[in-house]
Amino acid sequence: MKKHWIAVDWGTTNFRAFLLNEQQVIASVAQPCGLLTLSKDAFAATLHQHLAPWLTELGALPIVMAGMVGSQQGWQEVPYVAAPANAVKLRKNALPLSTPWGSPAWIVPGVSSASAYGLPDVMRGEEVQLLGLNALHPAHEHHAILPGTHSKHALLRKGEITHFSTLMTGELFSLLSQHSLLGRALPEQQDNSTAFVEGVLTANAGIPFNHLIFSARTRRLNGEIALSAVHSYLSGLLIGYELSTMSAEKESWVVGSPSLCERYLLAAQALDIPLRTADGDTCFLRGMAAFYAQLPETHA
């Protein structure tokens, strides 16, 4: 197995690649060339363009890709793997690709599952972070939150993703703050932890959701929250409502960027929910390394 290899996180809006020596990151590149900006026949050329300096220096390195690159709108669709899923199962169902320059490449499949509420659910990319979390912090069971546009609440047992539920927290915030009455005619917004926590606590008062979010307007109108803190309050409402589904008796992990983890940790503290944080990039790379370790010696 080659020591040098490339891990790629290719999503809807962004492309990120990491050059690794086994598990150590040597270099990285990030570009705003997600799948929404590319036609089907442009993926190979785009990939080569951004990896060219590494390929020139080190040759046709193995490439492992994860994320929406394997969706219907991506380079090639890779069918979801049904939970329970671990690194071995993901490897067996990965899609091998031939690149024009000779690098062996694979796209990691996403995972499908019934949610905690019995509805169908899917993820692409987050499965890698979950496997990385388990590799970094081995335990019989993990309850994990992966915040973002579509936040995932997942359960892992014995290193396998057993089931998960998607909550559209990030996308709802974007829609409500940018395209609804709640975000209209606001001054420049400032982070306000007091308003955020007030939103978190309000969201856990048993108020119907459609009524709850309207308080981002009425509390602004009556002066209970500053005009510059509406986004902080709205964020608190949405994250607080998301966390209302969690048990205060079980410790959970939040896996993501430092800024998002800090926000979720603040909300959890306000609700007395035990929560630990893990860096999303670190978990992603460790999960990709777990996948890479499963590849046949003759290819990697």
PLM feature spans:
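A short acidic Gly-Thr/Ser loop motif
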Residues: V8-N14, M68, I145-H150, T169, ...
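Phosphate/pyrophosphate-binding loops at sites that engage ATP/ADP/AMP, CoA/4′-phosphopantetheine
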Residues: Q49-P62, L243-K250
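ATP-binding/phosphotransfer module of carbohydrate and carboxylate kinases, centering on a glycine-rich
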Residues: F15, L20, L181-A300
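Short glycine-rich phosphate-binding loop at a beta-alpha junction
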Residues: G59-S71, G148, I239, K250-P258
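Short beta-strand-loop/turn "lid" adjacent to the catalytic site in phosphate-handling enzymes
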Residues: T56-P120
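Short acidic-glycine loop/turn motifs at beta-strand connectors
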Residues: N21-Q24, W101, L155-E160
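Glycine-rich phosphate-binding loop plus the immediately following alpha-helix
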Residues: L38, V111-P147, K152, L156-G206
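Short glycine-rich, Thr/Ser-proximal phosphate-binding strand/loop in the N-terminal lobe
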Residues: W5-A42
